[in-house]
Amino acid sequence: MRNGRSANQLKILAGWLLCMSCAHADPAARGEPAVAAHHAWAFKLTPSYYVTGGLADAIDLNLRGGRGAHALWLAHYRRAAEFEQTRIGYEYTVHLPIGQLIPSLQLASHGFAGGSLNAQIGDSVYALLGLGRTNLRDYYNLNFDPNDSIVVGLGTRLLPKSNVSLYTVRDNRLSTGQKVIHLVWRFAPDDHQRWTVDLSAKHGRPVADAEAVSGHALSLTYDYRQVFVRLARERRVNFSDADQTRVSIGLRF
C-alpha cells in the first residue's frame, strides 16, 4: 500500500513540476531577451538504467528544477518487485565573498531523511569541504559514496576550458572505514559542449564487522546543448560484492 501511495504522489508532483516548467520556461529559448533568463525556472529530467550483478535491473527517474539559488528534485527508483523508493529534496546555494555554501535536505519513502552541508572556498583555486548525515533508515544510495561522511578536497579552474577537482568522501560515523577518492575533470571546448570524466577508487567495509572490499569506477558524461548522456561502470558498487553498469540520458528545459 505504501508503494502505491508513493507512486501516486510521484505522478501528482511530477505533473505539478512539469506544469511549472511550462509556466516558467526560459524566455531566451523563445527568442525573448536573455536578461530575464536567470529569473526563470530551469529543469533537468534524467532517466537512468542500472544493471547490477545478482540483482534485477533497475530504473530511476529524476526531475530537478532550479531557480536562482533554489533547487528542488523529485525522483523514483524501482528495482522490479524487490525495492522501490520515492525521493524529494531541496538545496539552497549561498554565495559568499570567498566562495559558496550549499545546505540540502532529502526525504524518501521507507522513512528516510538525510541532509548535507557543502562548501567551496576560493575561485580559480578552491577547497572543498562537506558533511553529510542521515537517520540510517532504508535507502538505496544513488550517490554511491558514504552518506554519513565528511568531504575534503581541492580543485582548480586554471587549466584552459577545464575544471579539475580531487576529493575524498570518508565515513565518519558508522566505523566502516569506507573511503572513496574522486578525480573529476570537466572540459568545455565551446559554449555548447562539455565532457565530464569521474574516476574513483574505494576501500572499506559494508558494515563495521565485515571484511573490507576495494573497487573502482569510471563515469563519462557528454553534454550537447540541452541533452546529455552518461555511462558509468563501477566495481563493488556501494561496497557490496556486486558490479554495476549505469546508463543515463537527460534533457534540460
Model-derived segments and their meaning:
Residues 1-40, 240, 252-253:
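Cleavable N-terminal export/targeting peptides
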Residues 26-87, 249:
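Outer-membrane beta-barrel initiation region
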Residues 31-46, 145, 166, 176, ...:
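Long terminal segments
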Residues 41-51, 69-80, 88-90, 98-109, ...:
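Transmembrane beta-strand segments that form the barrel wall of outer-membrane beta-barrel proteins
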Residues 59-68, 84-98, 103-105, 113-129, ...:
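Feature captures outer-membrane beta-barrel proteins of Gram-negative bacteria and organelles
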Residues 134-141, 146-161:
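Eukaryote-skewed repeat-based solenoidal scaffolds used as protein-protein interaction platforms
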Residues 198-203, 207-219:
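An anionic, turn-rich surface loop/hairpin at beta-sheet edges
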